[in-house]
Amino acid sequence: MPKRTRFRKQHRGRMKGISYRGNHICFGRYALQALEPAWITSRQIEAGRRAMTRYARRGGKIWVRIFPDKPVTVRPTETRMGSGKGSPEYWVSVVKPGRILYEMGGVSETVARAAIKIAACKMPIRTQFIISG
């Protein structure tokens, strides 16, 4: 979540089209690319990162290419309609098809493929493993 934001609450918005930014490998050699649009929560991002780090152990470096900068509000349960918008409950990253989620470098392809596959299982969307070059 961001350190500070201009406004506490945001509109939900909609996810049209494909990702034109953040859709190329920049840092590592291997990457996980989204194939569907979705909101990915900060917990899902962290779970994927931890799974990759644990699998790769001391080898390699991991880059997380998405950041949860959108607050999602939730109303208390059994509350009547009206009386304003709910309070921010958690943070999400808006991901469109083509967006790179994670990158990995400094390891062999077999290790990277296995680590990224574990991270992909933590994601709520279909993804694909890609190699730069």
From Swiss-Prot:
Keywords associated with the record: Chloroplast, Plastid, Ribonucleoprotein, Ribosomal protein
Superkingdom of the source species: Eukaryota
A single GO cellular-component term on record: chloroplast
A Pfam family the protein falls into: Ribosomal_L16
Record-linked PROSITE patterns: RIBOSOMAL_L16_1 (PS00586), RIBOSOMAL_L16_2 (PS00701)
InterPro entries: Ribosomal_uL16, Ribosomal_uL16_bact-type, Ribosomal_uL16_CS, Ribosomal_uL16_dom, Ribosomal_uL16_sf
UniProt GO MF annotations: rRNA binding; structural constituent of ribosome
Subunit structure: Part of the 50S ribosomal subunit.
Family membership: Belongs to the universal ribosomal protein uL16 family.
Protein name in the entry: Large ribosomal subunit protein uL16c
Source organism (scientific name): Liriodendron tulipifera
